[in-house]
């Protein structure tokens, strides 16, 4: 009877050793550091302009042919035919102006795996397609090359965001793409929704992009470290030696 019991446990241990329990995860590749020289986003805007232009229309300083807070052509404060978060022609998402309710688009589904992985760092932002809102940071002290701009930044830094929007790092191949997406959505959200059309100048936009870029780099580093730690823990507890040890302890307790 004892030999049969021991033989069963040996069979279980043998199967556990040859089970493929390794965890295969795609890990983000490390990117470059802050201020490594030159633009890391080729094709993003004209020389001397901002590095994070929207996908269509004018630049951050003059969207849709209009100035900040100007109704002609649609400014950030008074967009043409509907505000931020509303389609052209008025109405909220799913209403589409004169469209009927049956034509309402389906709501985006948030990937709960990504939400759970980043729950400690921020909360999911409703209406932004699964973006997370990072924790508040101290605005970095940045030098812009001349005393006039440095003084302007110190006097107006409170107008710039101190939190960034981002997605889980496992959705990106490297730091550059994470930071690019993070800067775009954060600046857009801040200039359109948070400040409700505050009249930002081109200098404000340039400084805001620099500030947000550095905060996005910091956010990426935090998320990458947490991501690797979670992955290492899962791999450790799913490795064959650990399973063997746990099985042996169970054998001693049961036997």
Swiss-Prot record:
SUPFAM superfamilies: Prion-like. GO terms for cellular component: Golgi apparatus; plasma membrane; side of membrane. Residues 25-41 are annotated as: Interaction with ADGRG6. Glycans are attached at residues 174, 184, 199. It holds the Pfam family Prion_octapep. Cu(2+) 2 binds at residues 72-74. It is found in: Cell membrane; Golgi apparatus. Residues 1-24 form the signal peptide. Residues 55-97 have a biased composition (Gly residues). Sequence repeats lie at residues 54-62, 63-70, 71-78, 79-86, 87-94. One of its GO terms (biological process) is protein homooligomerization. Disulfide bonds join 182-216. Residues 54-94 are annotated as: 5 X 8 AA tandem repeats of P-H-G-G-G-W-G-Q. Cu(2+) 1 binds at residues 64-66. GO terms for molecular function: copper ion binding. It is a lipid-anchor; GPI-anchor. InterPro entries: Prion (IPR000817), Prion/Doppel_b-ribbon_dom_sf (IPR036924), Prion/Doppel_prot_b-ribbon_dom (IPR022416), Prion_copper_b_octapeptide (IPR020949), Prion_N (IPR025860). Residues 25-232 are annotated as: Interaction with GRB2, ERI3 and SYN1. Keywords: Amyloid, Cell membrane, Copper, Disulfide bond, Glycoprotein, Golgi apparatus, GPI-anchor, Lipoprotein, Membrane, Metal-binding, Prion, Repeat, Signal, Zinc. It is linked to PrP is found in high quantity in the brain of humans and animals infected with the degenerative neurological diseases kuru, Creutzfeldt-Jakob disease (CJD), Gerstmann-Straussler syndrome (GSS), scrapie, bovine spongiform encephalopathy (BSE), transmissible mink encephalopathy (TME), etc. PANTHER family: DOPPEL PRION, MAJOR PRION PROTEIN. The normal, monomeric form has a mainly alpha-helical structure. The disease-associated, protease-resistant form forms amyloid fibrils containing a cross-beta spine, formed by a steric zipper of superposed beta-strands. Disease mutations may favor intermolecular contacts via short beta strands, and may thereby trigger oligomerization. Its primary physiological function is unclear. May play a role in neuronal development and synaptic plasticity. May be required for neuronal myelin sheath maintenance. May promote myelin homeostasis through acting as an agonist for ADGRG6 receptor. May play a role in iron uptake and iron homeostasis. Soluble oligomers are toxic to cultured neuroblastoma cells and induce apoptosis (in vitro). Association with GPC1 (via its heparan sulfate chains) targets PRNP to lipid rafts. Also provides Cu(2+) or Zn(2+) for the ascorbate-mediated GPC1 deaminase degradation of its heparan sulfate side chains. This is Major prion protein. The gene is PRNP.
């Amino acid at each position: 009877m004892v030999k049969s019991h021991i033989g069963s446990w040996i069979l279980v241990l043998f199967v556990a050793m040859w089970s493929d329990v390794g965890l295969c995860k795609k890990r983000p590749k490390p990117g470059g550091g802050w201020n490594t020289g030159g633009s890391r986003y080729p094709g993003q805007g004209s020389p001397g302009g901002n590095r994070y232009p929207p996908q269509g229309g004018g630049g951050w300083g003059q969207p849709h042919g209009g100035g900040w807070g100007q109704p002609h052509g649609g400014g950030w404060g008074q967009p043409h035919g509907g505000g931020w978060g509303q389609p052209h022609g008025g109405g909220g998402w799913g209403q589409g102006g004169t469209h009927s309710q049956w034509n309402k688009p389906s709501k985006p589904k948030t990937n709960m795996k990504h939400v759970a992985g980043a729950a400690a760092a921020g909360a999911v932002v409703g209406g932004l397609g699964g973006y997370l809102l990072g924790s508040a940071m101290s605005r970095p002290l940045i030098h812009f090359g001349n005393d006039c701009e440095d003084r302007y930044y110190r006097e107006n830094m409170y107008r710039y965001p101190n939190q960034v929007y981002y997605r889980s790092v496992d959705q990106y191949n490297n730091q550059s793409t994470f930071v690019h997406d993070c800067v775009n959505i954060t600046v857009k959200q801040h200039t359109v929704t948070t400040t409700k059309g505050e009249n930002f100048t081109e200098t404000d936009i340039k400084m805001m992009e620099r500030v947000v870029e550095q905060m996005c780099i910091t956010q990426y580093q935090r998320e990458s470290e947490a991501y690797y730690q979670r992955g290492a823990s899962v791999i450790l507890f799913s490795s064959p030696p650990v399973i063997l040890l746990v099985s042996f302890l169970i054998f001693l307790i049961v036997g």
